[in-house]
Amino acid sequence: PLLCMHGQAQAQEQLLGFDSLYLSNTVLGLKFSTQTLAAKGKNVRMRGYMAPPLKPESNFFVLTRDPVAICPFCSSDAEWPVDIVVIYAKKTVVPINFSERIEVQGVLEVGSFIDPVTGFVSQLRLRDAEFRKIR
């Protein structure tokens, strides 16, 4: 019975793609898609690449649509890129090669948030996340 429950829970995890996160991005700001809003607070999966971290061995990292060799948000005048999601992991993350594709699973948080420790501002986050390398 326990295996069936686990399988059912895993089957219900929605796979969110970067293309479906936002409905629009205008001068008035980002508008989240109905798919993103419906997944708020739920366990979801996303696929992408780990951006180079702000500091090594932290409990968070940034998931990007495409591999990046430099920090995608370090410019002081940068606006929030639509192709990144902040990942707060269950445990300390040791950075992996930026060109290795990963799948992340965690609880989706939607809306502006300022990290009290780093001051990092995010629009979308996955909490209690875990990741694995994929091909």
For each of these PLM feature ranges, what is it?
Residues Q10-R135:
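OB-fold and OB-like single-stranded nucleic-acid-recognition modules
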Residues C4-H6:
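N-terminal signal peptide c-region/cleavage motif recognized by signal peptidases
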